[in-house]
Amino acid sequence: MLGKFIVFEGGEGAGKTTQLNLVFEWLTGSGWTNRIKGYIQGDYPSVLTTREPGGTALGKSIRKLLLDVTATGNESIDERAELLLFAADRAQHVSSCLLPHLQQGALVLCDRYTDSTIAYQGYGRELDLTLIHQLNQIATQGLVSDLTFWLDIDPEFGLARTHDREQDPEIETDRMEANEIAFHQRLRQGFADLARQHPERIFRIEAHQSDDVVAQQIQGILESRLQEWYP
């Protein structure tokens, strides 16, 4: 695997998307994008930004089904069906987007990946973790992030933030945000457990701080990794 895979994780309102975009701007402005370009094979961008769910054409349709409560009418989504839809989105995303870019040397910035499924469906929905790990293994073909930033925030504070932010124009009412507070507390514990289990990969960032402070912390960690990856 020639490229590097960086993931941004966290609960609702943690600021993942904001920080991913700030990292992309920083990479471009600081010259890293041009430096990485020297490692690219073929006609691929040096830095790719993407997300789950919704990083492919198929994924966009799955994303609306998963997140928009109006997409399925009055019919609720079974928890196992939800899990399988996330797995389907990931399988398509890995095979048609992530692997092709990584194999050509790109630096990939992704908004959510496997840790979200463990936290949301495993801890939040309390589904079987062994089953989730098996599905993740199938969907990812073994692809693991090189670096994950977990933006940790108190669920009540994060949910309050979501009411003030610019909403996804494709999602009328977010299904995940609508869950009870206990769900969000459980998934936060899931991320905490993952961070303890994988300290070499997952970095916890206190996300209640200002965007600028959080960005500086993330960029400081990433700068040292980039020096190692692209000497």
Swiss-Prot record:
Its EC number is 2.7.4.9. Pfam families: Thymidylate_kin (PF02223). ATP binds at residues 10-17. InterPro entries: P-loop_NTPase, Thymidylate_kin-like_dom, Thymidylate_kin_CS, Thymidylate_kinase. GO terms for molecular function: ATP binding; dTMP kinase activity. GO terms for cellular component: cytosol. It is an enzyme of class 2 (transferase). It catalyses: dTMP + ATP = dTDP + ADP. GO terms for biological process: dTDP biosynthetic process; dTTP biosynthetic process; dUDP biosynthetic process. Keywords: ATP-binding, Kinase, Nucleotide biosynthesis, Nucleotide-binding, Transferase. HAMAP family: Thymidylate_kinase. Belongs to the thymidylate kinase family. Phosphorylation of dTMP to form dTDP in both de novo and salvage pathways of dTTP synthesis. This is Thymidylate kinase. The gene is tmk.
